[in-house]
């Protein structure tokens, strides 16, 4: 459990979570426009 191990796990996690949130926001935005 070193300080170098934390960014190793944290960076890919953010790299996957951030695009997932962006895709979800875009998906909800498109669905809202289709309904209205």
Swiss-Prot record:
Its main location: plastid. The keyword Transmembrane helix applies. InterPro entries: PSI_PsaI (IPR001302), PSI_PsaI_sf (IPR036357). Keywords: Chloroplast, Membrane, Photosynthesis, Photosystem I, Plastid, Thylakoid, Transmembrane, Transmembrane helix. GO terms for cellular component: chloroplast thylakoid membrane; photosystem I. It is found in: Plastid, Chloroplast thylakoid membrane. It holds the Pfam family PSI_8. The chain crosses the membrane at residues 9-29. It is a single-pass membrane protein. GO terms for biological process: photosynthesis. PANTHER family: PHOTOSYSTEM I REACTION CENTER SUBUNIT VIII, PTHR35775. May help in the organization of the PsaL subunit. Belongs to the PsaI family. NCBIfam families: PS_I_psaI. This is Photosystem I reaction center subunit VIII.
């Amino acid at each position: 459990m070193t300080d170098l191990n934390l960014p190793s796990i944290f960076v890919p996690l953010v790299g996957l979570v951030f695009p997932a949130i962006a895709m979800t926001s875009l998906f909800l935005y498109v669905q809202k426009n289709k309904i209205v």
